[in-house]
Regions:
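Conserved, structured core segments of small domains
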Residues: 22-152
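Bacterial Sec-dependent N-terminal signal peptides
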Residues: 1-24
């Protein structure tokens, strides 16, 4: 499953890069803002979220509170500009979700993940990998905010 996801992400990045380079519309200001290299790419840290070993130690109510804290932490990291993309996987697999961090190192990303209540509680665990992808991924939060309906 993880291999399939990585292949898909790499393919999409390559397709986006190839399509963009064919248009010939280079925006130096945007490239600098997004910290893109000469081919429009940058390094990220990708986190794979797995079910942790301590899930069974918590009641349904406790897990619900941990999940609320997890979601609040996601919002906090996104507001800081560190968490660029996050989302769950479908199904009941042990692989629960993914984060993409704008982090300079694995250590920085690990420090960010260690602020998550679900990680602290052992309900989730993270596997971190450096990933080289399109700098355009940095625009996901801005675009997503324009697509998400306001809460009532």
């Amino acid at each position: 499953m993880k291999k399939t996801i990585l292949i898909l992400l790499i393919s999409l990045t390559g397709l986006a890069t190839a399509t963009y380079s064919q248009t010939g519309i280079y925006d130096a200001e945007l490239a600098q803002k997004l910290k893109a290299d000469e081919i429009g790419m940058k390094k990220y840290v990708m986190a794979f979220l797995y079910a942790g070993d301590r899930v069974a130690e918590y009641s349904k109510e406790e897990r619900s509170e941990i999940q609320k804290g997890h979601m609040s932490n996601i919002s906090r990291l996104a507001d800081m500009g560190k968490l660029i993309l996050a989302g769950p996987f479908f199904g009941n697999d042990s692989l629960r979700g993914i984060f993409i961090f704008d982090a300079a190192s694995l250590e920085e990303a690990e420090n960010l993940t260690n602020t998550d209540p679900a990680i602290k509680a052992g309900v989730l665990r993270m596997e971190l990998k450096e990933w080289y992808g399109s700098a355009a991924v940095m625009m996901v939060p801005e675009v997503h905010a324009r697509l998400q309906k306001p809460k009532n």
